[in-house]
Structures are given as structure tokens and as C-alpha cells.
Regions:
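Mixed-charge, Lys/Arg-rich low-complexity intrinsically disordered regions
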Residues: 1-12
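Short acidic, S/G/P-rich loop/turn micro-motifs used as interaction or catalytic elements
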Residues: 25-26
Length: 145
């Protein structure tokens, strides 16, 4: 029997990796005529009212718009050896931009739970997010960082 990946948003936790189509309405910048793109996101927090999550994107390459020193320092490497069931190659977790996504929308778009950050990566990413000046205190507080 094939293990279902359909996501139960009530049980999602920090560090979970979800595969979901995102579009411009979600804050994604789309190129080449795409209406949406399937993306891996990592949950890094929840809004106080509990209806939305704060998420970071996993990218196979660092986007050209993130090449300044400040934004390059916000790219966290995810090694394929730690995520063989999820990633096909070493990738980058973009810690410079938090996407707020409603739990309902992730469910409606058939988001799939693919796994979770390994504890070491989760701790380092959350520590970075707590200490970075890229996000103001209000943003950090909104997602419980």
C-alpha cells in the first residue's frame, strides 16, 4: 500500500517540508509564462490566530535577485545526503523572505508533506531567524520566532 502524503494541516510542525504549487498571489515571482510553480516550503512558524503558516522556500539555485552579500548570507545549504527522499541535489533554503500561506489554501492546493528538516538544520535555521536583522521584531513575533 502506498503511503499517502496528503497533508493534515492541524498536525504540521516547525521544520516540516511541504510540496505545494505556489503562484503570484502567494508572493512568488513567476517567469517564462508559468501560472504557478511546484515548490518545497519549510514551515518556520504559525500566525497567532492559527490560520496561516510562515514558510521559507527551498531552491535548487540561489536566485539572481539574492546575490547581494546580505541576502547571500540568508541562504542556508540543504545537503541532498540528509534529504535523499526529498531533494535530487544540494539546495538552498532562502531565509531572506517569509511567505505567509493559509493552511486552507495549502490543503486546497493538495500540498503534500514530504518530510522534515533534520534537527541540526532546524536548530540552525531557527537560530538564524531569531538573530537576523532582515526581519523586524513584529515579523518575528507574528510567527513565534
Amino acid at each position: 500500500m502506498v503511503k499517502t502524503e496528503q497533508i493534515d494541516m492541524s498536525s504540521v510542525k516547525m521544520g516540516d517540508i511541504i510540496y505545494v504549487p505556489l503562484d503570484e498571489e502567494d508572493g512568488l515571482i513567476l517567469k517564462d509564462g508559468y501560472k504557478d510553480r511546484n515548490k518545497y516550503i519549510v514551515i518556520i512558524g504559525f500566525t497567532p490566530e492559527g490560520v496561516a503558516v510562515g514558510a521559507l522556500l527551498i531552491n535548487s539555485e540561489i536566485d539572481s535577485s539574492k546575490r547581494s552579500e546580505e541576502l547571500l548570507n540568508c541562504q542556508y545549504p540543504l545537503m541532498v545526503r540528509n534529504y535523499r527522499d526529498i531533494l535530487d541535489y544540494d539546495s538552498w533554503l532562502d531565509c531572506s523572505d517569509i511567505f505567509e500561506l493559509s493552511k486552507l489554501k495549502i490543503t486546497k492546493k493538495n500540498g503534500k508533506l514530504k518530510g522534515c528538516l533534520i534537527p541540526e538544520d532546524r536548530e540552525r535555521v531557527m537560530q538564524f531567524l531569531r538573530e537576523t536583522e532582515v526581519f523586524d521584531n513584529a515579523t518575528k513575533k507574528r510567527y513565534g520566532i
